[in-house]
Amino acid sequence: MAVEVRFRPGARTDLFDLYTYIAAQSGRERAGSYIERIEAACMRLTHFPERRTRRDDLGPGLRTVGFERRATIVFRVEKDAVDIVRILYGGRDLEMALRDT
C-alpha cells in the first residue's frame, strides 16, 4: 500500500513563513530552492518513517528529523500517511511551537 505525505496547516504556514524570511534575506530563487529541498525531504519520509526519532515528550506519536542542520521536521506516522505537523527553523523551541499547534 502506498503511503501519502500530508502537510498539516501548521506545516504549510511554516513553509510560507520560511520562504518569506529567506526571500527577504537572500532572494526568491534561493528561498524557492530551499523550500523545494525541504518538501523533497518530507516526501522521502514515506521510506521507513519509523526509523526517525520518536518524541512522545512533545506529543503522542510525534517524530522529528533534522534538515540541513537548520530546520526540524515534526511529523506523525499514521496507518496510510505521514502527516507533516510542523517545520521549524533555526532552533525554535519545539515544545513552545507545538503548544501553539
Name the predicted role of every residue range.
Residues 17, 59-60, 68, 91, ...:
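Intrinsically disordered, low-complexity segments enriched in polar/charged small residues
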Residues 15, 19, 35-42, 91:
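Short amphipathic alpha-helical/adjacent loop interface patches that line ligand
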Residues 71-101:
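Enriched for short, Lys/Arg-rich terminal
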Residues 43-47:
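Short proline/glycine- and basic residue-enriched helix-capping loop/turn segments at helix->loop/beta transitions
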Residues 1-33:
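Arg/Lys-rich, positively charged N-terminal/basic patches that mediate binding to nucleic acids
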Residues 6-10, 29-33, 37-39, 57-66, ...:
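Localized chelating/binding microdomains
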Residues 50-80:
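Basic/aromatic recognition patch in beta-strand/loop cores that engages polyanionic ligands
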